[in-house]
Amino acid sequence: MPLENLEEEGLPKNPDLRIAQLRFLLSLPEHRGDAAVRDELMAAVRDNNMAPYYEALCKSLEWQMDVDLLNKMKKANEDELKRLDEELEDAEKNLGESEIRDAMMAKAEYLCRIGDKEGALTAFRRTYDKTVALGHRLDIVFYLLRIGLFYMDNDLITRNTEKAKSLIEEGGDWDRRNRLKVYQGLYCVAIRDFKQAAELFLDTVSTFTSYELMDYKTFVTYTVYVSMIALERPDLREKVIKGAEILEVLHSLPAVRQYLFSLYECRYSVFFQSLAIVEQEMKKDWLFAPHYRYYVREMRIHAYSQLLESYRSLTLGYMAEAFGVGVEFIDQELSRFIAAGRLHCKIDKVNEVVETNRPDSKNWQYQETIKKGGLLLNRVQKLSRVINM
């Protein structure tokens, strides 16, 4: 079971993804003037002399730049880079390949820390070419992956994920193999592949050491969120509800625990309240924010489906009471999801009764095939008309 005092087992927090989260918060209208968030972000910028990052930050957030601070940080950057270049030059003249590689790595890490993305990428790639040991090569690839996540550079992430997989197949150790799964899972969250994220996170719950990305409580929270939307009820029970490592952490995360157990225990009104809290948390999370509407909608459908599976018919009033909402709201919700083909039931408006009409899987597949075939045929016909013209 990972513990908070094992945080030193993580790689360096460079770049620090907390900075990306703070920057995201300040981009939201409701947090744009949040002095506490701005102070925390600027403290990190000053402490690390992040001149290149500060310039980009002021431009993206439309801040008035503190020219004196910028010049001070630029001077500190120039002095440190000069020192690092002198160390590299000395290593090239007087020392061996290992020392040269260490000096190159130190410069790359510094460029990464101050937010010089392009400079850091170039320096890490040069260092990679000088690196022989497989483990050290993988550590550089993890740096590139963190840079990719920090700036949400999809191409950088996908290319280096493949490179990391290839290196691990050559003989990467157990720790780095598991670490890569967490990196992949985090990126899967960012691109809305919740099913793959759940699989990767659940594989690493008991072996998590990637504290350079997030603390263990955040990791467990993410794991619960993606598992609830991705897993069927039996899998959720076996892998999450009965997961000793997850349950231990959930004692200190009561809101997340209530969200998980309220759905599993069919306490739907409590679940809807918890889902509203989760929605607000996701809006403020730099990875989940682009997907919060989709996530909340899918979880509502999931809850409605779970209740409807237990009955052949039930009244709108009963459903409204179960979910703690009004009859009009539940009527509109169900009508919308039925029309979209997401819920297999129909509403008897006269008697205010919901009747389930779940198709068997074969029939459903047949109907889907017919529907998609019709759409494809229409597109082919339109294309043929364009070509004939």
Curated annotation (Swiss-Prot):
Keywords, sorted A to Z: Proteasome
Pfam families xrefs: PCI (PF01399), RPN7 (PF10602), RPN7_PSMD6_C (PF21154)
Cellular component GO terms held in the UniProt record: cytosol; proteasome accessory complex; proteasome regulatory particle
Domain of life (superkingdom): Eukaryota
SMART domains: PINT (SM00088)
GO terms under biological process: proteasome-mediated ubiquitin-dependent protein catabolic process
InterPro entries membership: PCI_dom, Rpn7/CSN1, Rpn7_N, RPN7_PSMD6_C, TPR-like_helical_dom_sf, WH_DNA-bd_sf
Domain PCI: 193-361
Summary of subunit composition and partner proteins: Component of the 19S proteasome regulatory particle complex. The 26S proteasome consists of a 20S core particle (CP) and two 19S regulatory subunits (RP). The regulatory particle is made of a lid composed of 9 subunits including PSMD6, a base containing 6 ATPases and few additional components.
Role noted for this protein: Component of the 26S proteasome, a multiprotein complex involved in the ATP-dependent degradation of ubiquitinated proteins. This complex plays a key role in the maintenance of protein homeostasis by removing misfolded or damaged proteins, which could impair cellular functions, and by removing proteins whose functions are no longer required. Therefore, the proteasome participates in numerous cellular processes, including cell cycle progression, apoptosis, or DNA damage repair.
Family: Belongs to the proteasome subunit S10 family.
Protein name per its UniProtKB record: 26S proteasome non-ATPase regulatory subunit 6
Annotated organism of origin: Bos taurus (Bovine)
